[in-house]
Amino acid sequence: VLKKLPGVDVDENGQVKYKGKAIDHYFVEGMDVTGGRYNQINNNLSAKAVKSAEIMENYQSVKALKGKINSDEVALNLKLDPKARDQWITNGTLGTGWSDNNDKLLWEAGLNALQLGKGKQSVYNYKTNNNGKDLSNEQTRLTGNNQQQVPLSGFLSQPGISAPLDKNRLLFNETHTLNGNRMYKWNDDRSLRLQAGYTHDIIQQQRGNTQIYYQPT
């Protein structure tokens, strides 16, 4: 649905851009239930549930400044089909396999539930895998207006591996990510949003280097 909009692109991480610029706000029925972490919606909401998508240029997020100060912010608002609005939408996935190279069981599973209306919304999501699929963007704020997100510093930094392969071929992980979002909106001036998220990510990495020297005979 989004890719069909003129000027809209969606990159490999799920970030929505309009005319090359990341959107600053992502709304569903005028509400931002995920606080900019809209992959939790995009990855789980069926296209059939979306009635229309609207791009709003020069969107002013500060109500007191509307009509007084110009803004270069861009907002996206999804309007749902009346049959899907306020209804609980649930999805579940489960897949398993066996890796002969590592002699281990591989899995990928997910369970999510969404309830998106005009006055209250909920998004709950759990995903896990150990097959190399990166789930880090599930908790990442993707909107361009992300000043409120404070980067966390880790105790250890993992070196990157450069190779002409897809990322899932290089990632040996065991990841569990869980998040919950609940929002109430009484009017344009009063709303309440509750959010919680947790990610447990174990990444293993092995590196090797072989050098071969040839000498003329």
Language-model regions, residue ranges each:
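Membrane-proximal, glycine/serine-rich, low-complexity loop/turn segments characteristic
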Residues: 1-217
